[in-house]
Curated annotation (Swiss-Prot):
Residues 1-25 are annotated as: Disordered. Expressed in seed (at protein level). Not detected in pulp, stems and leaves. It comes from the Eukaryota. Residues 14-25 have a biased composition (Basic and acidic residues). Keywords: Antimicrobial, Fungicide, Plant defense. Belongs to the 2S seed storage albumins family. Has strong antifungal activity against T.harzianum, F.oxysporum and A.fumigatus with IC(50) values of 32 ug/ml, 34 ug/ml and 40 ug/ml, restectively. Lacks antifungal activity against R.solani, P.brasiliensis and C.albicans. This is Antifungal protein 1. One of its GO terms (biological process) is defense response to fungus. It comes from Passiflora edulis.
Length: 25
């Protein structure tokens, strides 16, 4: 899952990822 998560992060903007990370955390 870690590898897939990293790939998705690269694909999407970091701004949007920050929000996703918030939910994940």
């Amino acid at each position: 899952q870690s590898e897939r998560f990293e790939q998705q992060m690269q694909g999407q903007d970091f701004s949007h990822d920050e929000r996703f990370l918030s939910q994940a955390a």
